[in-house]
Amino acid sequence: MMAFITVKPEIKNNLANVAKELKIDEELLKSANRSAQKHQLYCPGYVIEEHSGKELQTIQDIKRFLQPRQLKLSDSWIEQEKIYDDSAVEKEIKKIIDVFPFVSCREIGRSVLGRPIWELKAGGEHAVKKVHMNASFHANEWITTSVLLKWFKEYCMSLCCNSPFFGFSPIKLFNSTSLSLVPLVNPDGVDLVLNGSEVMGARRDELERLNEHRPNFNEWKANINGVDLNKQFPSLWEIEKYRKPTAPSYRDFPGISPLTEPESIAMYRLITENPPDRLLALHTQGEEIYWGYKGLEPEESAAVIKEFEELSGNIYKGVRDIDSYAGFRDWFIHHYFKEGYTVELGKGQNPLPFQQFSHIYNATSGILWRALFFHE
């Protein structure tokens, strides 16, 4: 349950005035209160414990109550660099929707082991464009979740204080572009890499065998069934079938057919039910951005990739064509002829050491900001 304050219902008759007094964008405040009851006021950018105290009678009462609870972009929670397993992601999402009540959250599916796969959404009521971002398709690429959640908190907080980043107005982006974000596509696999097979119960022996009895699971990319989720999509899947492992493995097995795994099915349905205009999938490693697929990508991809390169400080390099099929982005471009980008974060051997996080984040954040922008 999101945290709200109890106010005199009449105060909400003029949300524009409330927004002005609290120095919150009016559309942002309206978005935060779309589902609020008449006595509830949700205030983005504040840390509010569930409030069931006395009814606040005036805007001045509200301001006095909120003042010591206001967050800033420099707050440690916004700036933190954190490793996330599945339970940490759930806790973070709970706080995000509490502090930023204009963010909605829903379960789009469940993993093999029954863990929820969450989608976060943020965007103005009249936003025309749609962007989707995701992280941790591959288990040992868990650092992508850390990058995406840190950036999303930065984006949400910048909306509350209307602080521009990379020359972009966050409020303009919010009002024009609806963002869909899945921070942890492969929760079982990420937990296996970070926490080991001890937490996997009856499947421990099977997982040790699929991992070829290595001392750890650092090379594990697949889901818990030993299927590579990013080789599961119906776009020339047969090519991957004939050249990749033919049985479950710690990496690269594309499954016995496309879309056999609950995680890939959830992502497939998410896109088919509401196709975005642009898609970004975060992976590691190589400091490259794959943007083409069989010549089916739209013309604007070539221009956008140049801006991505510049905003990364020319650390990332665009690569139009690679020898890869049946990926999430591949399928998206193949079937929708829209922009799709695989951003390969960092350099080194997966899982990348977390000491790289600051460098990776600094090179990536501008790309994520630019991804929300569309030329009129």
UniProtKB/Swiss-Prot annotation:
Gene3D superfamilies recorded: Zn peptidases
Segments forming domain Peptidase M14: 82-372
SUPFAM superfamilies from the entry? Answer: Zn-dependent exopeptidases (SSF53187)
User: Required co-factor?
Assistant: Zn(2+)
Entry annotation: catalytic residues? 344 (proton donor/acceptor)
**Is this entry keyworded Transferase?**
no
Supply one GO molecular-function term. Answer: zinc ion binding
Entry keywords, A to Z = Hydrolase, Metalloprotease, Protease, Zinc
Which InterPro entries does the protein's record reference?
A: ENP1_M14_CPD, Peptidase_M14
GO biological process terms held by the UniProt record? proteolysis
- Annotated Zn(2+) binding sites: 138, 141, 283
Offer a single GO CC term for the protein: extracellular space
Q: Which Pfam families match?
A: Peptidase_M14
Please state which protein family the record places this protein in. Belongs to the peptidase M14 family.
What protein am I looking at?
Uncharacterized protein YqgT
The organism of origin for this protein? Bacillus subtilis (strain 168)
